[in-house]
Amino acid sequence: MSSVEQKSINIKVIPRSSVSHIEEDLMGNLKVRVKAPPVGGQANQELIGLLAEYYNVSKDQVEIIKGRTSRNKVIRIN
């Protein structure tokens, strides 16, 4: 991704999974399974790390813009 390109994506997060990974359906929607529990922002931090690795950007470029306490989130990748 270039430094000026921004992308907002809808994501469904499933905390307390046995394995952390990202699934993409045919429509391009992401379902992200994280091992961390949804306590104290742990699942959100793991989500940010997984997405940064998936999109090959730094963690600072991944931002939760909606749904910080929900399983359904809108994420911005800068």
Locate each region found by the language model.
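N-terminal first-folded block
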Residues: 1-31
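C-terminal structural segments of small proteins and small subunits
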Residues: 7, 48-78
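Basic side chains
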Residues: 12, 16, 31-35, 59, ...
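Compact, glycine-rich, soluble single-domain proteins
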Residues: 14-17, 32-55
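A periodicity- and composition-biased signal for non-globular, repetitive helical segments
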Residues: 18, 22, 39-41, 72-77
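Short glycine- and Lys/Arg-enriched binding-loop motifs that mark or flank ligand-binding interfaces
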Residues: 24, 36-37, 63
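Short glycine-rich loop/turn motifs that provide flexible caps or phosphate-binding loops at active sites
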Residues: 27, 39-40, 66
